[in-house]
Amino acid sequence: MAQINCTQVTEFILVGLTDREELKMPLFVVFLSIYLFTTLGNLGLILVIRTDARLHTPMYFFLSNLAFVDFCYSSVITPKMLGNFLYKQNMISFNACAAQLGCFLAFMTAECLLLASMAYDRYVAICNPLLYMVLMSPGICFQLVAAPYSYSFLVALFHAILTFRLCYCHSNAINHFYCDDMPLLRLTCSDTHSKQLWIFVCAGIMFISSLLIVFISYTFIISAILRMRSAEGRRKAFSTCGSHMLAVTIFYGTLIFMYLQPSSNHSLDTDKMASVFYTVIIPMLNPLIYSLRNKEVKDALKKLIASKNQMLSS
């Protein structure tokens, strides 16, 4: 077998969302506004949950971790994308690209698995309310959060190592606004069959298992709600689960659209638009979904603002 002449790539060029100069500044302003709102919303939600004793429950423990993941998730991608709107040569070093891919995969996987943990929490709350504090003890809650973090970071590390051990000799221009797997694989001259098989198996197991947990949990939840005799009880139960159902639908729906569409319809331009949605828009939407639809969070936020105003006026 002939030896591939592999020149070590030291940096990549991120093509970005657009090459039209007149669009770059408006897009910079839009995405900067979204990122600031995302940061304020997610860190604000964590602060509200941490400072209000009424929110020290399993449901809000999971929600604060989801907000943390959303903040990290967005921060891995958006600042570099904002910088690329301002510079003509959108360079990223080899090591920085590897770190970005690894962190992105870790937080995306963690979010996917955390949504499954939250679905299980809602299942226990609706279907086994008398045993809720036993089945969702602090130790179990910690395990339901620690397991997604541990699994996601180990998988992301192995995934990034496999990707960046490949030989890149075709080009160093990544047709994306961040370092993602599929655009990177198009630049390599190494055999990628084993790598693609790893992606398919690992992502498939993670995605199907987490989606199955969510589906089974909500099948039992909806069945239990429909059996409730009290209309007020049904309304309260649907209200409790509605925010999570909406967040799950948006997140998994975007991933299904991106990764399960026919290969004939698959293009990097379509990937870019879908990637904007789940790397930039979803982390901004989640605090809105969980706070605007949640009376306890809104009351805690009002209480926090009132106490801060009282401190400033005294």
Curated annotation (Swiss-Prot):
PROSITE patterns: G_PROTEIN_RECEP_F1_1 (PS00237), G_PROTEIN_RECEP_F1_2 (PS50262)
Disulphide-bridged cysteine pairs: 97-189
Topology in membrane: Multi-pass membrane protein
Subcellular location: Cell membrane
Keywords: Cell membrane, Disulfide bond, G-protein coupled receptor, Glycoprotein, Membrane, Olfaction, Receptor, Sensory transduction, Transducer, Transmembrane, Transmembrane helix
Family annotation (CDD domains): 7tmA_OR8K-like (cd15413)
Transmembrane segments: 26-46, 55-75, 100-120, 134-154, 197-217, 238-258, 272-292
UniProt GO MF annotations: G protein-coupled receptor activity; olfactory receptor activity
Family in the record: Belongs to the G-protein coupled receptor 1 family.
Name of the protein this chain belongs to: Olfactory receptor 8U9
Organism per entry: Mus musculus (Mouse)
